[in-house]
Every structure is written in C-alpha cells, then in structure tokens.
Amino acid sequence: MAGTPNYNRREFLATLGAGAAAAVVFDQSAARENAGLQSIRKRIEARTFPSVFQAWNPADNLKDEDKLTTIARHDLLFHGVGFFGLKWDHKHAGLATKFRKDSIRRGLAKRKELLDKNPNLILIAEIRYRDASRKWFPQDYKWWKRGKDGKTMLGWAEGGHLQMDFSQDAYRKHVAAQAGAAVASGVVDGVMLDWWRDDDDRLALMKLIRAAVGPDALILANANDRTTPRTAKFINGYFMECYRSATPFQWRKIAETLAWVEKNLRKPRINCLETWYHKSRKDLHLMRAATTLSLTHSDGYCLFSDPNTLSSGDHLHNWYAFWNKSLGRPKAAGRRNRDGSARREFDNGTVVYNPMGNKPLTVTFDAARTSLSSGKTGRTHTINPCDGDILLLKPSGSAR
C-alpha cells in the first residue's frame, strides 16, 4: 500500500475526534507516578539470563508461592488490559477510547507491586483488533466483519470470538486510539497485537498504532515463525508462538526467523520465543532446546508451555529450575555452526544448543564446568540432539 501515510504522533492526534485525542495524551499523574522508574531500554538491558516471558496465562506449578511473586519471575508479561486493572470507559469495551480513572489508579498500583518484585519487568497490554467477544461491539455494529452472506465470522474454529473488520480506515484509527490510551495510562510499556502478518490493512494499522503510542513505547506482534518485512521497522519484537516443532525443518525455520528478527526489528528488541510440549511438561529436552535456542540466537525471552489444543487454558506452563537466573549477561554474540548447533559465552558460563536432527554434540573446556541439566561437573559434556545445556563455571546458587 504505497499510498499509506506515515503519521507522527501530532499528525495522528489531528485525525481523531477531540475525545479520542484527549485519551491518548499522557495522564500527568501517571507520568509523575512513574518518573522514578528505569526507562524501558534500561530495564531490557539490565536483566540477566535466562530470561523468560509470560504469555497471558501463568506458571501454575509453584502452588505455595504468592501469585505476583511467580509472575515477577518472568522478565516480560503480556495480557489483556483487564489483567492490569484497567477498565474501558464504555458499556461496549470495543467502542471506548479511554479508561476509567479509578482503574488507571489500580493499574498503576499493580505495576508498582510487580516492578518492586522485579525492577526489570516489561509490561505489555494486548490490544484487540482482529477478533473479540460478542459483547465487544453492539450486535449489529458496522465494525464486525461479515462474509458474503452478511453473517458475522468466527475468530477461529473452536473459539467464541467474532472477527472485526480492520479493512475500514475509521476502525483502524479507533484501534490505534485504544493503543495510545493504554500507553498513555502509564500502566504498561507498550502493546501487543495477535494474529500478525504483512498485508496492506495491517501495514496501515501498524503505522497508525506506532504514531499513537509514540517512538519509545514497545510494540510486540505475534507472527509465529514467519517474518513480516513490510511492518518490521515499526515492531520491537515478535511473539513467536511456534506451534510447529516436530521436525528438523521446523526447528531450522524457528532458528532462522529468530536470527532475522534480531537483526531487522526496531530497537530496543523484545523477541519472545515460545514452543509447546509434545507429550507432557516433562519434555525437559524440548524445554532446554527452546531455552538455549533463545539464549544463543537472541537477547530475547523464552517460554515452554502447554499446547493450545488443551482445554485448560493456552500458554499455561511450569516454572523450571533451568530458568533460574544463573548466567549473568552475555559477553558476546552467539556463534553458530554449519550443523545448526550454537554456542554463546555469558558472565557465568556457556550455553550450547544442539538442534533436532544432529548427532550428539561433545564440548570440552579447559576447566571443569557444571551442567545445569544433569548436575554433573567435568571438562567434557555431551548434548543430545533437540536439547541444550547451560554449563556453569561454578555450581548454580539458589537465585530465582
């Protein structure tokens, strides 16, 4: 869409009505409340590794731990606006352009609680643009997407959501205003867009959203294992919801996409790699493979979770001891080999990734290392295919 304009924030506000424009102007009390917090970039750069994210639903295996403490084990969280305490100021949430003031106060209090527990945590609000519950708009509203028969269209086969028509320019501007309101609240650091791909309508929408949230807010988009070159410069990170990880080809595609986004998306980057278990949460080799792939190919975040086919709720997961902070910061970029394996040096040890389809990989060090996967200490360690390991200079402590 060559004719799609590139808006800046001032120009975007000028396209909106007065009420919607006011909603995306920063609330002064919110700005004062957050003045002492580290900047987004500093929080991203200050965190240590491994670095895990939460996609909507939590880690649910730490039954005796306070829920906010478990959330704060993660370094990035995205969720619906309601999770953060925000409530749209309209009977139909999809028609709102601002939040109730009391909900902004609740949201700021929850943000403070979480950042007190993890000062490097990044908070992202999902903005719905493609599908939503049937209550999002009035039943016959013009922004529902309809098929040739005039009937509304399901969001996806097994879900109860309906699709919205983001081919309409007025609707795209409205979505952008909602994104701007979320960031303007001061409760979150940016917005997340699901079901992302490159097409003319999404490009037009993305330009409006970037103008609405400003240059410093974060935009996360779920492109799965695909790349989106047309919208890349507006996006800080992909939520790589990788539902295909059964073959060597699929793992190669994941690795190639992760390497691409680390070079081509907007800085600061917040790429989030998720794979799902095949048989159970005890597929520890798959968890380690996803974690070490993320560590060797990116400065991003990882997650290993339940598959969406379960009825219990998408993206539920365990918190694994392998994810406890042990590595410190990376000392250099990862080094990738022709066979697809990779290695990266950190302050406190070395990460090795061995992809599906490879032979077992043996690594030897000048001095003894402790394997985080086995607990064994020695100079030589073997990593099986579709697995990875963290090899520490000294045994790991009890850091979360």
Each predicted region: which residue ranges?
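Generic anion/oxyanion-binding catalytic loop in active/binding sites
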Residues: M1-A2, K112
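N-terminal secretory signal peptides and thylakoid transit peptides that target proteins
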Residues: A2-G19
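Glycan-processing catalytic domains of CAZymes
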Residues: N34-G397
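Generic macromolecular interface patches on structured domains
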Residues: A22-A23, F304
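Generic detector of low-complexity/intrinsically disordered segments
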Residues: T15-A18, Q28, S374, L393
